[in-house]
Amino acid sequence: LAGRYSGVGIWLRAGIGGGSEISSLKKGSVAKRAGLKVGDVIILVDNVDLSSASVNEVAAALRGKAGAVLKLSVLRKGVEKK
């Protein structure tokens, strides 16, 4: 695959209740600037339901060409945030 690919600056782990939970945020990352927080569970990426996807599947959905825009929805303390 040719081109530059990038992530959003998060580390994931399997969530206790399922899904993929943010375990760490890179300082100064796009994710941190967008307001994501440790403990958020990623449930949608670009309107694709990832609530029961593996950590690897969620990580793959978050990777893309540098500068690409992603729309995320997360669960934060049981409340959906977009």
Labelled PLM ranges:
Residues 21, 43, 57-82:
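PDZ-domain C-terminal substructure recognizer with occasional recognition of PDZ-binding tails
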Residues 13-17, 25-28, 47-48, 65-67, ...:
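Solvent-exposed coil/turn segments that connect beta secondary-structure elements
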Residues 1-24:
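PDZ/PDZ-like peptide-tail recognition elements
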Residues 20, 30-32, 51, 80-81:
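Short beta-strands and strand-coil junctions in structured, solvent-facing domains, enriched
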Residues 6-8, 34, 66:
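Short glycine-rich loop/turn motifs that provide flexible caps or phosphate-binding loops at active sites
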Residues 31-54:
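Conserved PDZ fold ligand-binding element
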